[in-house]
Amino acid sequence: MTKTKQEIYNKRPTSPHLTIYKPQISSTLSILYRMTGVALFFAVSILVWWLILSKYDNNYLQLAECCIIKICLVAVSYAWFYHLCNGIRHLFWDIGYGFSIKLVNITGWCVVVGSVLLTVLLWV
């Protein structure tokens, strides 16, 4: 007995949906690494534009005193430190070190704690 294409298609296994997976530190940090890379592209572009404008008009420089701008600068610096720390982690992976589950989890938490500490050290 021959099966039609539709019957074969209906019996194909489907991939599990993302909602059934428990988020792990490695997957969460991987997604955040990509997100911070994109966010930093735009943030640094805006920051450079702002610095160029502040050279010609001091009003732009005075914006740095605004609380919202300071919060944004802290967030950008955290994203930068996070991206830096996770990039160093990826460099170790590139040379073949740190692929055990235990080391992946330890280095993941080191990235999170390290980026927070570096941000605090910068702004305090």
From Swiss-Prot:
It comes from the Bacteria. Signal peptide: none annotated. GO terms for molecular function: electron transfer activity; metal ion binding. Pathway: Carbohydrate metabolism; tricarboxylic acid cycle. It holds the Pfam family Sdh_cyt. Residues 1-29, 89-103 are cytoplasmic. The heme is bound between the two transmembrane subunits. InterPro entries: SQR/QFR_C/D, Succ_DH_cyt_bsu_CS, Succ_DH_cytb556, SuccDH_FuR_B_TM-su. The chain crosses the membrane at residues 30-55, 68-88, 104-124. The keyword Cell wall biogenesis/degradation does not apply. CDD domains: SQR_TypeC_SdhC (cd03499). Part of an enzyme complex containing four subunits: a flavoprotein, an iron-sulfur protein, plus two membrane-anchoring proteins, SdhC and SdhD. The complex can form homotrimers. PANTHER family: SUCCINATE DEHYDROGENASE CYTOCHROME B560 SUBUNIT (PTHR10978), SUCCINATE DEHYDROGENASE CYTOCHROME B560 SUBUNIT, MITOCHONDRIAL (PTHR10978:SF5). Belongs to the cytochrome b560 family. Membrane-anchoring subunit of succinate dehydrogenase (SDH). This is Succinate dehydrogenase cytochrome b556 subunit. The gene is sdhC.
